[in-house]
Swiss-Prot record:
SMART domains: AAA
Role this protein plays: Part of the ABC transporter complex RbsABC involved in ribose import. Responsible for energy coupling to the transport system.
Enzyme Commission code(s) on record: 7.5.2.7
Main enzyme class: translocase
Classification via Gene3D superfamilies: P-loop containing nucleotide triphosphate hydrolases
GO molecular function, one term: ABC-type D-ribose transporter activity
Organism: Rhizobium meliloti (strain 1021) (Ensifer meliloti)
Keyword match Repeat: yes
Name of this protein: Ribose import ATP-binding protein RbsA 1
Enzymatic reactions: D-ribose(out) + ATP + H2O = D-ribose(in) + ADP + phosphate + H(+)
GO cellular component: plasma membrane
Length: 503
């Protein structure tokens, strides 16, 4: 079978960095190819070349039997190449339908936008993407997961022969993920060539037919997914066997550091109570929309609770803003790190040291050497992949930007750190590094709240787990009694067979 599109001998360099070196990739009609690699391996650069955002320094692109170039993103789109990115650009002030058909809206015989047709077509595309909401509503009124479905519908609006999905399930619920799997099967049946980029091996082995592995900008291997194991892919990705992805150290849990009592919000959550102890990793699990992130944002002063009390080291604490939380020793690493954490246009080292300038200044003057030393300490412990610390953080891959944000808040030397989806979008090698660092911090006496939607991560790293459902605590479990079934039942409100009650 001939590839729908093939890249041959592609190379691309940026100042100080060789992003791709003589790589090749072939995508076949009716087949899903998984592109696998650590953050910084070159996956994002290749996707940008495929979609006309970057131009290769060397190599060729073949569309069917014809050699071609994509000088612009529009040229790639017109050639039938479309992409669903982790951070697909959408516009909050436009309607869902307008976002879907931006740049190629249906028009009537007078050349004006046919709004009735546009909304009808948008509704049909949303249905194909597994969404059932009104296409006329403003995008700003949707949550993260639904915005992601709009991005999928937008990609489907172009009659593409090649569909690129870059971490498409990152913000989706379990139900939406299964609907996406069904959509991919329909794309295959329609003869589309699908490039699937994911760090979740269960997804890769469920839906991919072929694989291609990148490491440090080079292609390491390719073939049929049926011919490899997860361990094989890991070894190709990192050049070594990754020991334990969840290196949880056994530590002596101390006295309560943070106590939360009767915390509630008019619309997001109610009656949240718990204690967080010194050296403990407390996991918060739940499905999308359970209220975990909303509660954490209220806890650190982004939103105001309607009732409740917080004590830190036994002292009542009133937090009116994130700045007050940071001064008290509570920091929050958000889920949307690209939008809420990293400052694009600023160097890596300044991103890391920005909240910690009191540690790197003397008599009101910044000391550059101390800034670099502080940034180097925390970025190296998280295995950041960057050419230099004065590099613009915007040039890093998404996973490495996440590491910069985590390093930034750890550098403040807090008492409590809240990590919201700490390894979302991070490759398996980097996950192990982040988990090892979390375990080390807990062993040193730092108290950690970890919000995660990944059951293996929750079970592998937590000393205790609180499950939330619909803004309430639905279950509490010690590490010794954790099972995947208990977590899922509590999160979904599934009745236990033993007593007929919801978990």
């Amino acid at each position: 079978m001939k590839p729908a599109i093939a890249l041959e001998g592609i190379s691309k360099s940026f100042p100080g960095v060789r992003a791709l070196s003589d790589v090749s990739l072939a995508l076949y009609p009716g087949s899903v190819t998984a592109l696998v690699g650590e953050n910084g391996a070159g996956k994002s650069t290749l996707v940008k070349i495929l979609t006309g955002i970057y131009q290769p320094d060397a190599g060729t692109i073949r569309l069917g039997d014809t050699e071609t170039t994509f000088p612009t993103a529009l040229a790639a789109s017109r050639a039938g190449v479309t992409a669903i990115h982790q951070e697909t650009v959408l516009f909050d002030e436009l309607s869902v339908a307008e976002n879907i058909f931006l740049g190629h809206a249906p028009r009537n015989r007078f050349g004006l936008i046919d709004w009735k047709q546009l909304n009808a077509d948008a509704q049909a595309l949303l249905g194909r993407a597994g969404a059932d909401f009104d296409p006329t509503i403003r995008l700003r009124d949707l949550g993260i997961a639904k915005k992601h479905l709009v991005a999928i519908a937008r990609a489907l609006s172009v009659d593409a022969r090649v569909v690129i999905m870059d971490e498409p399930t990152a913000a989706l619920s379990h139900k939406e993920i299964h609907e996406l799997y069904d959509l991919i099967e329909r794309l295959k049946a329609d003869g589309k060539a699908v490039l699937f980029i994911s760090h979740k091996f269960d997804e890769i082995f469920r839906i991919a037919d072929r694989y291609t592995v990148f490491r440090d900008g080079a292609m390491i291997g390719e073939g049929l997914i049926a011919d490899v194991s997860q361990d094989d892919l890991v070894r190709m990705m990192v050049g070594r066997a990754v020991g334990s992805v969840y290196p949880k150290k056994e530590v002596t849990i101390g006295q309560p550091v943070l106590t939360v009592s009767g915390y509630r919000h008019p619309t997001e959550f109610e009656d949240i109570n718990f204690e967080l102890r010194r050296g403990e990793i407390l996991g918060f699990y739940g499905l999308v929309g359970a209220g975990r992130s909303e509660f954490m944002q209220s806890l650190i002063g982004i939103t105001r609770p309607s009732a409740g009390a917080v004590k830190l080291d036994g002292e009542v604490l009133v937090i009116r803003s994130p700045a007050e939380a940071i001064r008290a020793g509570i920091v929050y690493v958000p889920e949307e790190r690209g939008r809420q954490g990293a400052i694009i246009g600023m160097p890596i080292f300044q991103n890391v040291t920005l909240p910690s300038l009191s540690h790197t200044s003397r008599s009101g003057f910044l000391r550059l050497a101390e800034e670099f030393a502080l940034a180097r300490e925390y970025t190296s412990r998280l295995d950041l992949r960057a050419a230099a610390l004065d590099q613009d953080v915007g040039t890093l891959s998404g996973g490495n930007q996440q590491k910069v944000v985590i390093a930034k808040w750890l550098a403040t030397r807090p008492k409590v750190i809240i990590l919201d989806e700490p390894t979302k979008g991070i490759d398996i090698g980097s996950k192990a590094a982040v988990h090892a660092f979390m375990s080390e911090l807990a062993a040193q006496g730092l108290s950690v709240i970890m919000v995660s939607s990944e059951i293996p991560e929750i079970m592998g790293m937590s000393d205790r787990v609180i499950v939330m459902r619909e803004g309430r605590v639905a279950g509490r479990y010690e590490r010794s009694e954790l099972t995947a079934e208990k977590l899922v039942r509590a999160a979904a409100g599934i009745e236990t067979q033993a007593d007929g009650r919801a978990a």
